[in-house]
């Protein structure tokens, strides 16, 4: 019997470049660990938890056979890990094929908020360096304050 999926499954997207394309800045081995290890692990982890949720909904798991708070924490962790790695891959480019200062509206907004791109880089780097252990720093637009935040 084929069971209908209640939730769309996450997929590991292809890298937008070859694994060695970021050398000498990021080695092929590090890209491989992050892509085939971490990123793939987040996708598989999210999908395994979605399968568990489907079993709960279908009544295949009884009370006491699952921890809904743990499942929600796991989904949050794995889905965020997947989405952040997807952003990570798309935010980088091989040498000579990207990077540098942004242009257009983003450049204008950074200039307005930070005074200069160099000042933005300093603030962003400070935010990244202040994280305990390992973690992510991302630039995002806060619609409530109409400012960029990291």
Task: For each feature predicted by the language model, list its residue ranges.
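Feature for soluble, non-membrane regions of globular proteins
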Residues: 1-150
């Amino acid at each position: 019997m084929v069971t209908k999926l209640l939730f769309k499954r996450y997929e590991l997207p292809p890298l937008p470049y070859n694994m060695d394309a970021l050398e000498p800045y990021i080695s092929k081995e590090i890209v491989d660990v992050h892509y085939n290890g971490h990123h793939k692990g987040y996708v598989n982890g999210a999908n395994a938890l979605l399968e568990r949720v489907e079993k709960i909904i279908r009544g295949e798991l009884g009370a006491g056979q699952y921890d809904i708070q743990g499942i929600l924490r796991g989904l949050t962790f794995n889905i965020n890990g997947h989405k952040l790695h997807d952003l990570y891959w798309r935010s980088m480019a091989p040498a000579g094929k990207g990077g540098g200062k942004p242009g257009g509206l983003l450049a204008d907004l950074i200039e307005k908020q930070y005074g200069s791109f160099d000042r933005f880089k300093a603030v962003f780097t400070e935010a990244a360096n202040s994280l305990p252990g390992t973690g992510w720093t991302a630039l995002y637009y806060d619609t409530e304050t109409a400012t960029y935040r990291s």
